[in-house]
Structure formats: C-alpha cells, structure tokens
C-alpha cells in the first residue's frame, strides 16, 4: 500500500485554491453581508488560544455538512452565495478544506495565508476562549 504524504495533498490544494492575505481579509470583511470568516480549527485550539473576533467557528469535521444545503446539519444562517474565508492555525487544513468545498461546487471559497497567527499579527482582534 502506498500512502500519499499529507504535504503532497496540501501542495496540490495550494496549487488550485484561492489564497488571500490578512490585508485582503480585512478589506473583504468591510462588507460583512457578502463575506464570512470561518475558523475551522478544533475546539481545543479555540480554548487554548481564542479566535478572531467576528469569525464563525465551523470545525473541520463538520464543515461540509454545515455548508451543504442538502445536509440535515445545514446551517441556514450562512447563505450559499456568501464568500467563505477559511482559516486554521497555519494554512494546511484550510487549504485542504477549501479544496473540498471547491469539489462540492463552491466557487466563492478561499483561505488565509498564514492562518490564525497571520490575522493576529496583522491586528485582527482576538476573542478569548469560548469557555
């Protein structure tokens, strides 16, 4: 059995997904009716380091289910038409998640270069632990 290394999967995703900078995120979020920032990190990461104020938490394991209008778990408060800006801790998981959403048919999905830390470094406000 030959296992494809995760780094190769990430590299393949990065080659086709849209990657945006923290600066671009800031500009996009000036229009919150058309853009949503989604934190796909595990809940334990949010407990340990907080999240970005105004972002929506959608754990990686539920993302596809929560965004699929055909799913019984669909989150109706996030319209299909809204641009979805994903971030994780660095950008590996968000690249893979963005690719998966593209495979589902979303053409309005992208991820943040450098992930959570790049948003913090740029000056996004941190919201504390959800506990």
Regions found by a protein language model. Give the residues of each.
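Rhodanese-like catalytic fold shared by cysteine-dependent sulfurtransferases
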Residues: 1-35, 43-84, 92-131
């Amino acid at each position: 059995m030959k296992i494809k290394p995760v780094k190769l999967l990430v590299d393949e995703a990065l080659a086709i997904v849209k990657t945006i900078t923290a600066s671009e995120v800031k500009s996009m979020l000036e229009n919150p009716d058309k853009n949503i920032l989604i934190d796909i990190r595990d809940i334990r990461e949010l407990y340990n380091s907080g999240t970005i104020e105004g972002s929506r938490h959608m754990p990686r394991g539920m993302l596809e289910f929560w965004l699929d209008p055909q799913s019984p778990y669909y989150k109706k408060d996030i319209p299909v038409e809204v641009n979805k800006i994903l971030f994780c801790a660095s950008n590996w998981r968000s690249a893979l998640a963005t690719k998966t959403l593209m495979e589902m048919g979303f053409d309005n999905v992208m991820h943040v270069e450098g992930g959570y830390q790049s948003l913090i470094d740029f000056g996004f406000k941190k919201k504390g632990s959800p506990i």
